[in-house]
Amino acid sequence: TYEEIQPFMDKIHSQHKALKKSSKMRQEFTANVSHELKTPLASISGYAELIETGMAKEGDIQHFASEIHKSANRLLSLINDIIELSQLDVMDHQLSTTNVSLNEEVVSCVDMLQMNAEKHNITIATDIIEKDCIIKANQEMIQEVIYNLCDNAIRYNKPEGHVWASVFKKDDNIILQVKDDGIGIPEDDLNRIFERFYRVDKARSKKTGGTGLGLAIVKHIAEQHEAEIQIDSTLGEGTTISIIFKTMNK
């Protein structure tokens, strides 16, 4: 009967809309990446040609080399995003786990990002780091989660802003938390920021870089580890993202 078929038709219609939406976002992503790949490549080619042909003045060579270095780093970042996108759908088959010390991984990541934070005039530090916060997880994936959360907090911050990374125990859980006092996220966007390709402020994203995949990767990895994500954000005041892991004895 119609009543019996209707739920299936509604489900198919909903899936069709989701596929169209995903396809549109993928097209926007491809167009954006194509543009962003060309920009640093053109910069590298242009500055390198000036140096190679001897047209660069001696005092300009160091500046040109610096610009080439910046553009090369931008290219590397884009390529890494594209690789991560291709890996999202195969992560399900690669979840080999071991005992991972969250406190050690957070300290290591914060140390690694110090120089990048300083370039953006941002202070990044560990806040609460409890010992023996051990989870059963894929170490590389956990490193990716911590890096993406901290990198986003640096990227979308204010001048002279702060980023704090914490690991602590609460009830029967171990919580990884990254907090910033940056620009915050509009309430209407909170439910969408973990979607693939989604970027809250496209104009700002073009300035800061990134392809809108970082938080999608975080969400996917969290789901793989049966972890819960909580986000609290106030526009103009900052954002706190918490990943709640079950303890090993649960």
Predicted segments with their positions:
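Short conserved segment of the HATPase_c
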Residues: 185-199
